[in-house]
Curated annotation (Swiss-Prot):
Positions glycosylated per UniProt: 75, 275, 290, 319
PTM annotation: The N-glycans attached at Asn-75, Asn-275, Asn-290 and Asn-319 are complex oligosaccharides containing xylose, fucose, hexose and N-acetylglucosamine.
PROSITE patterns to which the protein is assigned, alphabetical: PECTINESTERASE_2
Enzyme Commission number(s): 3.1.1.11
Protein name as it appears in the record: Pectinesterase
N-acetylthreonine PTM sites in chain numbering: 1
Cystine crosslinks: 151-171
Top-level taxon of origin: Eukaryota
Pfam families: Pectinesterase
Native organism taxonomy: Eukaryota, Viridiplantae, Streptophyta, Embryophyta, Tracheophyta
Site, as annotated: Not glycosylated: 19
Activity: how regulated: Inhibited by PMEI.
Length: 321
């Protein structure tokens, strides 16, 4: 469905031409525990506010004017006294949340440690053509089932992290220029029990350097992930990896912590960063060409996409391709 075909329930505009001038006011106006979709159209502009879609605010949809046009921005960080969890510019818990055409940013900067742009703990949440801009801990895929399609994610350290069941499909993941003596790590998945059906699935994505990193690529090492928790689970499937990825591919968290219990897989990736000949030799890591091993990480199997995503009117494929 084209954005123009979706009729919003309320409009947010900085210039007063809508129903509200802040996103937060529009969220507050949504009926609690709604089974019907409530659409908030957020007109182009930069909204400097912290937005909380709590568990009572179900089936909300944010529609913006596109990446780089509609911005929600904040700068909370751990250095400035917030917890990682509370540092998020936008936090979503209400089930059935959809965002489309919005840039979420935490502009605290690379010296402020953890500073989250968006945290999702919303089951059945989906993000289409959105961007997530930060440095350390940009995108907190906190918990439950979530889907990201045609999104751009920018960061430095552990910038896609958490313990959701998350699939990123056809997204662009960009490592930025960190501080001196810092490394870039795309993921830090937080599964702490082998029975949890959680993980980060990177499917048919581009793994690349952001514009500010390109001229200084040789000064910084960049890795696909590191194990935040003991049973960390992350897969890169059919993705295109630029040359920024260190030949080892993956980084330890602390000594040999989790190296036997983690589950990291690479499957049929392409590009100069996908060369696996010098990869780590941890017991929990493997390169696989076995489709039956990775089929569990598709939208259909990993997050049961056929039960909910197909009604969201956003492009999705349930299988590997």
């Amino acid at each position: 469905t084209a954005v123009t075909d979706i009729v919003p329930d309320v409009v947010v505009a900085k210039d007063g031409s809508g129903n509200f001038t802040t996103v937060g006011a529009a969220v507050a106006a949504a009926k609690d525990s709604s089974t019907a979709r409530f659409v908030i159209y957020i007109k182009e502009g930069a909204y400097f506010e912290y937005v909380d879609v709590d568990k009572k605010k179900t089936n909300l949809m944010f529609i913006g004017d596109g990446i780089g046009k509609t911005w929600i921005k904040g700068n909370r960080s751990v250095v400035d006294g917030w917890t990682t969890f509370r540092s998020s510019t936008v936090a979503v818990v209400g089930t059935g949340f959809i965002a489309r055409g919005i840039s979420f940013e935490n502009y605290a900067g690379p010296s402020k440690h953890q500073a989250v742009a968006l945290r999702s703990g919303a089951d059945f949440s989906a993000f289409y053509q959105c961007s997530f801009v930060g440095y350390q801990d940009t995108l907190y895929v906190h918990s439950l089932r979530q889907f990201y399609s045609e999104c751009d994610v920018y960061g430095t350290i552990d910038f896609i992290f958490g313990n959701a069941a998350a699939v990123l499909q056809k997204c662009n993941l960009y490592a930025r220029k960190p501080n001196e003596n810092q490394k870039n790590i795309f993921t830090a998945q937080g599964r702490d029990d082998p029975n949890q059906n959680t993980g980060i699935s990177i499917l048919n994505c581009k793994v690349a350097a952001a514009a500010d990193l390109i001229p200084v690529l040789s000064s910084f090492k960049t890795y696909l992930g590191r194990p935040w928790k003991e049973y960390s689970r992350t897969v890169f499937l059919l993705s295109q990896m630029e040359s920024l990825i260190d030949p080892a591919g993956w980084l330890e968290w602390s000594g040999d912590f989790a190296l036997t219990t983690l589950y990291y897989r690479e499957y049929k990736n392409t590009g100069p960063g996908s060369n696996t000949t010098a990869r780590v030799t941890w017991p929990g890591y493997a390169v696989t060409t076995n489709e039956t091993e990775v089929i569990q990480f598709t939208v259909g199997n990993f997050i049961q996409g056929s039960q909910w995503l197909t009604s969201y009117n956003i492009p999705v494929y349930l299988n590997l391709t």
